[in-house]
Structures are given as C-alpha cells and as structure tokens.
Regions:
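Short, small-residue-biased leader/transition segments that mark boundaries at the very start
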Residues: 3-18
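Short glycine/serine- and small hydrophobic-enriched flexible loop segments
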Residues: 9, 146, 203, 216-221
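Short internal beta-strands
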Residues: 15, 80-83, 216
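Short alpha-helical patches at coil-to-helix transitions and adjacent helical residues
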Residues: 11, 138-141, 212
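Extended, hydrophobic alpha-helical segments in both membrane/secreted and soluble proteins
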Residues: 63-64, 77-78, 197-198, 208-218, ...
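Anionic-ligand anchoring segments at beta-strand to alpha-helix junctions in alpha/beta enzyme folds, i.e.
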Residues: 15, 20-35, 210-213, 220, ...
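Short alpha-helical "patches" and their helix-cap loops
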Residues: 155-167, 213-227
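Active-site cavity-forming subdomains of large catalytic enzyme subunits
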Residues: 31-197, 202
Length: 227
C-alpha cells in the first residue's frame, strides 16, 4: 500500500516454471533460461512504464536471482523482498519437509516404504505457503539478497505465513523511497565486496551450488568479473 510511504504504487507480476515438474525430462532445459526471462520481463516492465524505483518480491528458485539481475541491470533504486520459506510439517513428533519426501520416494521405489506411509508423509510435509523448506536455491538466494545488500536485514528469515512480513513489506517501501530521494542505485550497493560477502554466506549456510551460477550472473549485470 501507499500509506506512510509517499510513493505511487503500481504492481506487476512475473511467472516462473516449476522445475520440480521438469526433472527427468527435456523440460529441465528451460529452468535456467527462465531466470533470464524473468530478468528480461522485469526490465521491460520497468522501462515500459518508466518506473522510478522497484520493490521486487520473489518467492521461488529462479525468480530470486532473476529479480536481482534485473535490479542491477536497470540500476534503479531497488529493494528486494523474499516471499518467505514454507513452514515444516509434523509427523510422529518430528519436523518434516519436502526433503523428507524426496528421500521417501526413493525408499518407496526400493520397496522399503509402503504406499500408505508415503501418502501420509506427502499430506503433512508442506503445510503452508512458501518456498521449499530446505537450503535449496530459494532460501540460499534469499540469504544472498541480504548479504549482497539488496534486502533489508532479517527480512529473508520470516517464513511466508508470518505476520511479521507485513512489517518488512512496509519497511521495504519506506526504504526504497529513501533510496530514491538520495539517488542510491542498485550498482552502488552491489559491488565486488558485497558479492564476495554473499559467496561467504552461501558457504557458511551450506547453500545450494546453484549460487555458483547465479552470483556471477548478477555480477555480470553490474559489469563485475566474478568467476
């Protein structure tokens, strides 16, 4: 909303394919390309409507680096906000996530897990909105968004269903207006030093190896050699 921010808000959406449905066949060839398509779409939307600044909300895998690539390419005042991770499910007194489902599918195929046990796990493993509950691409790049300086501190840690996200949404709007007023642009923030900091965060958190693809792509948009 516009209350307390002072800017004229306009919202636009960008689609992303689900790579989990693309695994094991030709569809997976489209996964990385979708990142670049997202960056292109955000760029065209911003340029086509002559927007002055952007608060970019992204929630799953390729949409995060795609959004950050667009911010750096456009070099406008930019604040990134993560859509948030899913909450864990509970089964037999333990937290379970989609990662447990991955393992269970293998156990089922090996004949070590019954149909009913697999169905029971699948019903409880993903109980809320949000990105996959593991340090996969989405949560890794969410950590990167803070380390790189595009997201507000602690904003990427709030799970998708938490009401604290309302606060971060408003704060992100206020932050982007402050950046606009002071003419602080994305490339003023995304530097070689911030990229190195982001790489350290990926290593320290046991992040996804896909960051090895996405960090150089973000750097490339800023004209920084980061290989």
């Amino acid at each position: 909303g516009e209350d307390g921010i002072g800017g004229l808000v306009r919202s636009r959406g960008v689609g992303e394919g689900d790579k989990r449905q693309a695994m094991g066949h030709e569809g997976m060839r489209s996964s990385l390309a979708s990142r670049d398509a997202i960056a292109d779409t955000v760029e065209l939307t911003m340029r086509g409507h002559c927007y002055d600044a952007i608060v970019g909300l992204a929630g799953c895998d390729k949409s995060l680096p795609g959004m950050m690539m667009a911010m750096v390419r456009l070099n406008t005042p930019s604040v990134f906000m993560y859509g948030g991770s899913i909450l864990p499910g509970r089964l037999n007194g333990k937290d379970v996530t989609v990662q447990d489902v991955f393992e269970a599918v293998g156990e089922h195929q090996a004949g070590n897990l019954s149909d009913e046990a697999l169905r029971t796990l699948k019903r409880v493993a993903c109980p809320s909105a949000g990105a996959c509950g593991g340090q996969f691409t989405a949560n890794t790049m969410a950590c990167v968004s803070e380390a790189i300086g595009l997201a507000l501190p602690n904003s990427s840690g709030a799970p998708a269903p938490y009401e604290s996200r309302d606060h971060y949404g408003m704060a992100s709007g206020q932050a982007v207006m402050n950046l606009l007023e002071k003419n602080i642009r994305a490339r003023d923030i995304v530097t070689l030093k911030s990229l190195q900091n982001a790489a350290r965060i990926v290593a320290c958190t046991g992040g996804s190896t896909t960051a090895g693809l996405h960090l150089p792509a973000i750097a490339h948009e800023a004209g920084i050699d980061f290989n």
